[in-house]
Amino acid sequence: MRHAKRGRKLGRDAAHRNLMLGTMAGQLITHGRIKTTEAKAKELRGVVDRLINIAKRDDLHARRQAVKVLKDKRVVRHLFEEVAPDLDDRTSGYTRILKLGPRQGDGAEQVYLELVNHRVE
């Protein structure tokens, strides 16, 4: 039975899944919006929300925790200096999912995952 089992496997082992989610979180933080599948977006929401909450603390330990997930100090700097201060008035709900419809090749549901303060240019 699958009681109390949280999260999606996304067809990957744990190490691959964690690296993929960290990379996708970095891309979302850098660009403000990414196009992905619905399942990946729903998993990524939690990762990004946790990272932004960590970034709001803005201390050395918080930066080290963020580097552990994001693996790129430039992205961490962007998160702490630009993204987190903009979202300081919120306590959660930093992302939104916009559905785009099925992908041409395999029919997977495509979505935009974006930060709520992202301005479309």
From Swiss-Prot:
Signal peptide: none annotated. The lineage of its organism: Bacteria, Bacillati, Actinomycetota, Rubrobacteria, Rubrobacterales. The keyword Transmembrane does not apply. One of its GO terms (biological process) is translation. InterPro entries: Ribosomal_bL17 (IPR000456), Ribosomal_bL17_sf (IPR036373). GO terms for cellular component: cytosolic large ribosomal subunit. Keywords: Ribonucleoprotein, Ribosomal protein. One of its GO terms (molecular function) is structural constituent of ribosome. It comes from the Bacteria. Part of the 50S ribosomal subunit. Contacts protein L32. The gene is rplQ. Belongs to the bacterial ribosomal protein bL17 family. HAMAP family: Ribosomal_bL17 (MF_01368). This is Large ribosomal subunit protein bL17.
